[in-house]
Design a protein with these regions (language model features):
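Ferredoxin-reductase
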Residues: 1-78
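Structural signal for conserved beta-strand scaffold positions within catalytic alpha/beta enzyme cores
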Residues: 6, 51, 154-156, 209, ...
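A generic structural signal for residues embedded in beta-strands
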Residues: 36, 84-85, 227
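Short, Lys/Arg- and Gly-enriched loop/turn segments at beta-strand edges
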Residues: 42-51, 89-99, 237
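FNR/FR-type flavoprotein reductase catalytic core
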Residues: 71-216
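Local cysteine-cluster metal-coordination motifs and their immediate loop/turn environment
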Residues: 112, 190-191, 212-242, 270-276
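Short Fe-S-cluster ligation motifs
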Residues: 235-239, 243-280
Length: 280
């Protein structure tokens, strides 16, 4: 049984679950993901591992409640169990030998960026963290980032917390001022990662992006997570999720990401109706 040992609401729409999964915790590395099903009839949800404790045998996942599957997952309480919890899947983020790295996260993507920043910090890498949110109420994991970053910058769209603006502004400034990053690692909305790459490419700063497209089985069989990288078809679940940002076709990825929106909306509405019936 994959029991929820701890539950934490990070903001009104983002939840962290700490799940007892000793075999996964034993092998997990930063950048890898799991696939979870809340209940037997739930959809399979790929989520990048947000943290793990090998001694306690626990794995943390962080998700935003956006559809029927995440609504069902969010309905589970401490001491209850998820139906399936499979992993670790995908390739770990390659960080060996890096001396100076900028980690750029956006929104709930910061949950994926955090374990990478922590792993970099643990190996002695200088870490500059830049994270962006729409407003103060949506800021997550600030204390955790500050603990592992040599420099940490928070950006909000409306200026209600940290600095006003988007993550590319301080990133550009750091590069122009001669930060000499070995690599920029960015995780967040596709449009954000696209513009991070547009910022770094003219300066020839290697940029790694974490791609999280539609995914079903997590083993390369369904082909749902296919991407075009360097003119070739790649599968995020087995070839990634990390890719060279200079090579990713972001426009195609964004188009594919909208293909199932009507179905997702229908499923969410149906789940809301079921929850209303349970309350009544």
């Amino acid at each position: 049984m994959f029991t929820i040992v701890k539950r934490r609401e990070l903001n009104p729409t983002v939840t962290e679950l700490c799940i007892h999964a000793p075999l996964i915790a034993k092998k997990a590395k930063a950048g890898q993901f799991i696939i979870v099903r809340a209940k037997e009839d739930s959809e399979r949800i790929p989520l990048t591992i947000a943290g793990f404790d090998r001694e306690a045998g626990t794995v943390s996942i962080i998700f935003q409640v956006v559809g029927a599957g995440t609504m069902q997952l969010n309905s589970l309480k401490e001491d209850e169990a998820v139906h399936d919890f499979v992993g670790p899947l995908g390739k770990a983020t390659e960080i060996e030998g890096l001396k100076n790295v900028c980690v750029v996260g956006g929104g709930v993507g910061c949950a994926i960026a955090l374990p990478i920043a922590q792993a970099l910090h643990e190996q002695g890498t200088k870490v500059t963290g830049i994270v962006g949110f729409r407003n103060k109420d949506l800021v997550i994991l600030e204390d955790e980032f500050r603990a592992c970053c040599d420099e940490f910058i928070i950006m909000t769209d409306d200026g209600s917390y940290g600095e006003k603006g988007v993550v590319t502004a301080p990133l550009e400034q750091k590069i122009v001022e001669g930060a000499n990053f070995d690599e920029v690692i960015t995780i967040g909305p596709l449009i954000m990662m696209k513009f991070v790459v547009k910022t770094t490419k003219p300066h020839n700063v290697k940029t790694v992006v974490s791609m999280n497209p539609i995914m079903v089985d997590g083993t390369g069989m369904c082909g749902g997570c296919r991407l075009t990288v360097g003119g070739q078809t790649k599968f995020a679940c087995v070839d990634g999720p990390d890719f060279d940002g200079f090579e990713v076709d972001f426009d195609e990825a964004m188009h594919r990401g909208t293909m199932y929106k009507p179905f997702e909306a229908h499923a969410r509405e149906a789940e809301c109706n079921l929850l209303k019936q349970e309350v009544q």
